[in-house]
C-alpha cells in the first residue's frame, strides 16, 4: 500500500508562501507534510505569529507537519520542547507540529522506514549574532550521526526507505561556492564541509533508498552510487528542494515501503 505526502524545503518564516503551500497540499488531499528545515522557528512576536498562523491553517485542514530542523532555527526554543511517546519533539500549543530529534527513526502507517538527521552549517555565520539569528546548536555533530546509526541498527533495518535531512551529503557534484563574498572565511567553509562529510558517512551506514534535503535553495535530482561502510555498493536517489519563492520548493511524493519514493509531482503555490 502506498500513500502520498507533501515535502517542502526552506520556508524561512515566510507566512504568505508557507500558507500558499499548505493550501495547495490540502487541495491535493495531502494530510502529512514533511518539512526539510529552515522552517521558521524564530524567537519573538514574528516567530509566534508564524507558528500560530500556520498551525491554525493545518488544524483547519486536518494536516500534520513533521519538521526536520535546519540551521536557521531558534535552538533555545527547540531545547524547551517536550518529547512524545513516539520520540517526536513538540511545542505544547502546536500539537499539529512535530519536530524530529537528530537521528530519529520511525515507520509510517504503511510500513515505510524513515530517518531524520537535521542541522547544517551556516556559511554566513560571521554576519550573524549568536542567540539572535545564529545558534551553535545548528551543527550536525558526530554524536548526532552515531545516534542515527544506533537507532537504525537497533531495529535491524537492512536499509532506510526515506532519509530526511536539511543539508546535502558531501560528494554531490553540483554543490560548492563559486563566489567568495567579503564575509567569507575558509574556516567557516571547513566547518560547513565537515558536517556534510559526517552526513555522507552516516548515509553510508544506514543506506537510504531515497534522501530528501533542503538548505541549498535549489531543486535538484540525482542518483548516488555509494559504497557502504561494509564495502558493498548501493544506490540512493537524491531529491533537493528549493527555498520559499522558488520553483521546486514543494512537491507531493508517493511513499512506497521497501522502495522509497515513487511518483513526484512538483507544484507552484
Report residues per predicted region.
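Active-site environment of divalent metal-dependent phosphoester hydrolases
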Residues: 12-19, 40-45, 69-79, 105-107, ...
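Core catalytic region of metal-dependent phosphoesterases/phosphodiesterases
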Residues: 8, 14-109
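Short loop/turn motifs at secondary-structure junctions
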Residues: 29-30, 113, 159, 207
